[in-house]
Amino acid sequence: MQSSLFINFITFFILITIISVSAGPIKCPPINSTASNSTQKRYVVFLSNDKTHYKWLKECYNRTVQSIKTTKIPVDKNSILDISIKGKFYAYSTWYYPEFAKKYLSERPETILVEKDLRVKINQCPKKNESSTNLTVQTNPTFNLDRIDQANFPLNKKYIFPSSAGSNAIVYVVDTGVLVTHKEFEGRASFLGAFCVGCPDTDDNGHGSHVSGIVGGKTFGVAKKVKIVGVKALDSKGQGTNADIINALIFVLIDAMEKKNNAIINLSIGGQRSEALNKVIKLLTDNGIHVVVAAGNEASDACLTSPASELSAITVGATEVKTNDITNFSNFGKCLDIFAPGRNITSVGIQSNTSIATFSGTSQATPHVAGTVALIISKFGNQKPDEMIKTLVKFSTKNLISNTKGSPNNFLRIPPP
C-alpha cells in the first residue's frame, strides 16, 4: 500500500514539474530598436485567435487594449486598437519598430499577417468647379444619369428609374465625410463617425459629399430615396491610411450587423495593393455587405492596387461624356467588373447647403454603381454579394466599350422601372 502511494506521489510530482516547465515564463523579446535611425511604424496585424496575444503584449510591454466599439482612434502609440469580431475575425493596429515586427511578431504561432500601414487617397482628378446655386427640380437630368438608363447614345433627356428608388437600402460612404445638411439629401444622410486623428465630424474636403450626391441626391443621385451614412476616414486633403480605412470598415460591419440593414459600402479610394485591406473587404462581403470600389486613376492595371484588386468587391472603371471610350485616367484589367460615367460629373458641393460641384474620376464612376445596387435591392430584394455582381452584369450593356485593355466589356445600366 505504501509502495503504491509512493509511486502515485512520484507520478504527481513529475506531472507538476512537466506542466511548470512547459508553461514557463512568458518570453519577452526586445521590443525597442537598437538602431539609432529606426522609428516606429504603424502595423495592421491579423491573428488566428486572441487568447494569448494580448496577454503577451500587456505583460511584456504594458500595451493597453482598446476596442473599436468604444474607441475609433488610437489614444497613443502604446495602445492597441482591437478590431476583432468574436468568432469571425481577429485583428488590431498599433505601432512597432520594424525589427520587432519582422523578427518576433511575425513568428508567433497565432500571427497570420503583419502588414505595415499604407497610404490611400481619393480617386478623383484635382480640377474642380464649384458654385453656390438654389436648386430647383430639373426638367432634364445630368448627362450621366441620362446615360445609365439606356443602352447607347443618343441620350433622350430622361432618367427613368424604379419608383422604389433605393428606399430600403443604406449606403455607407467611407470617405472624407458627408455634408449631411445639404438640401440634396433631404434629411436622408447621417454621420457615423470619424476614424482619422484630428479629423472633424464633417466633410472638410468635399469628395465624400460629392460621391454621396451621386449615390442618392434628389437631383444628381441614382437612388433618390436611399439612406446615406457618412464615415470619415480621410483628411482634408483626401488622404489617409489603410489602418484607418480598415478600422472604419470594421465599425461599419458591426453597425450593419446590429441594425440588420441592406448595407452597401461605397469606397472611392485607392492605394498600393494590400492583403490586409483585401482581407477585410472579403470579410464584409462574406457577411452580406456589398462593397463597391473605384478602379483607380493611374491608367494602369487595377489588379496592382487595393481595394480594386479584391475580387469579391464590385470594381468600377470610368467612361467618357460623349463616347463609350474609357477615360484616359481610368485603371483597367481583369479585376474590373463594370464601367460607368466618370468624366465631368456634377453633384453636391460643400460651400453651402445648396452648392454644386463638378469632378472627374473613377471616384465618380463608383457611386453610380453603388446607387444601382440600392435600386436593385429596393426593387427585387437583397442578394448575396456574388449574386449582385451577376445581376449588375445581366442588366449591363455588353460589348459597347472600345479598347477595354483586358477589362470585362460591361457598361452600367440601371434596372427597368
Language model: regions and residue ranges:
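Autoinhibitory propeptides
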Residues: 31, 69-144
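C-terminal subdomain of the subtilisin-like protease fold in secreted/lumenal serine endopeptidases
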Residues: 226-230, 250, 254-283, 287-289, ...
